[in-house]
Swiss-Prot record:
It comes from Rhodothermus marinus. It catalyses: Transfers a segment of a (1->4)-alpha-D-glucan chain to a primary hydroxy group in a similar glucan chain. It holds the Pfam family Alpha-amylase. Keywords: Carbohydrate metabolism, Glycogen biosynthesis, Glycogen metabolism, Glycosyltransferase, Transferase. It is an enzyme of class 2 (transferase). Belongs to the glycosyl hydrolase 13 family. GlgB subfamily. The keyword Transferase applies. This is 1,4-alpha-glucan branching enzyme GlgB. The active site is at residues 305, 356.
């Protein structure tokens, strides 16, 4: 009996075997296990493990076309650990299975450390209702508010001990639901030996990290979140892979998964290796991996890490090799990204793909048939950098940098954007969001509430890294839990309540969902002397007015032109006492009088609290 068919080999060789995880890796039956691995340059491959006392001579594999090796091992059962012994000339190494569905923790002996585990992926799902109604591309016209989470440091059950996948399910779902977020985005859960990489230096692309439990435990977490109405996005890292010798690097004694070109194969920023997207086996491996997480784990989307490093051959390099036309664009990576997105949406049209792309590359979220890269969303890194640069300034100097606040609206509709305040902004000495805010504690809290008010008013979906929602003092530390004790203090409870109320307003008001140009209208972006901006969000007959005062100076009788007369309701005020503010405002209601201002036929005369966001709505729209 042959494990691989001629059609399997044809698809593998053509780089279109996008469900290759069904054949490669370890696949147990009642009597033993089929093993299959890609090692085209190997002179010999055998499987060794707990079932043969780690004897590399006991179970040699047979060579097939396309550089594939396969064989059946009687008595190899689920739970057994294993590796592949690869021989190429004088080279010999014991390698972790690239397609392993589970791996042991990154500890153990030099022979058995990081061994793969024969694993069945059986699980009974209970999320049918969620899977039927999840949005995917339809989310462009729905609220999307993402809570970014590192599972190992969100909350600890005791000092230094993280929750398991199963243990964290209920408290995480309770919190996310209470806070009003629509999705959770998990930092990479794929197996990574170096905990301090936060999951971005992957060895086991098909194996959820063993630190928090089994594959079924992770399935339970995702299933539970779905049952609570919460979507799950995974960070996915096809841009580079870990340098651990047991992993993908120099897999068959040659540069197999990585580039052959020494100028291109190594990533100097991260000490990792770069995938060679030209190789059919690499494309099979990565695109299959994306589909694997969407199918087997029911994830709702993939956030693709470090896309800019894939697009440019000279990204963060002093020496690099141009493409065939002499340019800096990585043509094979571009083609891979397009094929990845096309394949995902072909098989999972209700999924989401999101690009962390930090340059001005055009059409990141445009469809491939319009010469785009095909992602559904792109992180708006320009908005993030400009807004954080602005809000960190002493308010007395903000008027000289007013364009940092307003420039993002020139390009806000060029892509389908997510506004990210991610983990990257609260690490490596950058400080926490709270720490970035100028002034004393009162001003820090007010500035942070103001930042969030503008973020939720600005066009684009929302993403906030854990801890930011209550103003954590210290930058994120993956070894400790968040500073939950700060919620004993009024300022931090107030910030948390403000984010909660912003989320609930966002989810219930269609004026905030439509991120096209017709859903946004400037009222005034030119009052740099007083550092005030005001704009409308509108959709489906609803309208919200945002008035933002970026100085600690209260402003009485501040006029704002509006298109509708009559009473306007003060929906939210970040300076409310409940949020830790001074309680200044407009007593919940103000009348728009028929006198032109800002080119509108009516105007409101408002009291602007210091460092505050006001959100108003006409009572009769």
């Amino acid at each position: 009996m042959s494990w691989l068919t001629e059609e399997d080999i044809r698809r593998w060789e053509s780089g279109t075997f996008y469900d290759s995880y069904r054949k490669l890796g370890a696949h147990p039956d009642d009597e033993g296990t089929w093993f299959c691995v890609w090692a085209p340059h190997a002179d010999g491959v055998s499987v060794l493990g707990a079932f043969n006392d780690w004897n590399p001579e006991a179970n040699p594999l047979e060579r097939y076309g396309g550089g594939l090796w396969a064989g059946y091992v009687p008595g190899a059962r689920p739970g057994h650990t294993y590796k592949y012994r690869i021989r190429h000339g004088f080279y010999q190494a014991d390698k972790t299975d690239p397609y392993a569905f589970a791996m042991e923790p990154p500890t153990g002996s030099p022979i058995e450390g990081l061994a793969s585990i024969i694993t069945r992926l059986d699980y009974t799902w209970h999320d049918d209702e969620w899977m039927r109604r999840r949005k995917g591309p339809a989310s462009l016209y729905e609220p999307v508010s993402i809570y970014e989470v590192h599972l190992g440091s969100w909350r600890h059950k005791r000092p230094g001990e993280s929750f398991s996948y199963r243990e964290i399910a209920e408290p995480l779902a309770d919190y996310v639901q209470e806070m009003g977020f629509t999705h959770v985005e998990l930092l990479p859960v794929m197996e990574h030996p170096y905990y301090g990489s936060w999951g971005y230096q992957v060895v086991g692309y098909y194996a959820p990290t063993f630190r928090y439990g089994s594959p079924q435990d992770l399935m339970y977490l995702i299933d539970y979140l779905h049952q609570r109405g919460i979507g799950v996005i995974l960070d996915w890292v096809p841009s580079h892979f870990a340098a651990d010798p047991q992993g993908l690097v120099f897999f068959d004694g040659t540069t197999l998964f990585e580039y052959d070109d020494p100028k291109m194969r190594y990533h100097p920023d991260w000490g990792t290796y770069v995938f060679d997207y030209n190789k059919p086996g690499v494309r099979n491996f990565l695109i299959s991996n994306a589909l694997f997480w969407l199918e087997k784990y029911h994830v709702d989307g993939l956030r693709v890490d470090a896309v800019a490093s894939m697009l440019y051959r000279d990204y963060s390099r002093k020496e690099w090799t141009p493409n065939i036309f002499g340019g800096r664009e990585n043509l094979e990576a571009i083609d891979f990204i397009k094929k990845f997105n096309e394949t995902v949406y072909l098989h999972f049209p209700e999924a989401m793909t999101i690009a962390e792309e930090s340059t001005a590359w055009p059409g990141v979220s445009a469809p491939t048939y319009n010469n785009g890269l095909g992602f559904l969303y792109k992180w708006n890194m320009g908005w993030m950098h400009d807004t954080l640069d602005y809000i960190q300034r002493d308010p007395i100097y903000r008027k000289y940098h007013h364009d940092e606040l307003t420039f993002s609206l020139w390009y806000a509709f060029s892509e389908h954007y997510v506004l990210p305040l991610s983990h990257d902004e609260v690490v490596h000495g950058k400080g926490s969001l709270w720490g970035k805010m100028p002034g004393d504690d009162w001003q820090k809290a007010a500035n942070l509430r103001l930042l969030f008010g503008h973020m939720w008013g600005h066009p684009g979906k929302k993403l906030l890294f854990m801890g930011g929602e209550f103003g954590q003092h210290h930058e994120w530390n993956h070894d400790t839990q968040l500073e939950w004790h700060l919620l004993d203090q009024p300022y931090h409870r107030g910030i948390q309540l403000w984010v909660c109320d912003l989320n609930h307003l966002y989810r219930t008001n269609p004026a905030l969902w439509h991120d096209g140009p017709e859903g946004f209208e400037w009222i005034d972006f030119s009052d740099r002397d007083q550092s005030v901006i005001c704009y409308l969000r509108k959709n489906a007959g609803r309208m919200l007015l945002f008035v933002l005062n970026f100085t600690p100076v209260p402003r009485e009788h501040y006029r704002v032109g509006v298109p509708i007369g009559g009473p306007w309701h003060e929906v939210l005020n970040s300076d409310a006492v409940a949020y830790g503010g001074s309680g200044m405002g407009n007593f919940g209601r103000v009348e728009a009088v028929p006198e032109s201002w800002h080119g509108r036929p009516f105007h409101l005369e408002l009291t602007l609290p210091p460092l505050a966001a006001l959100i108003l709505e006409p009572e009769h729209g």
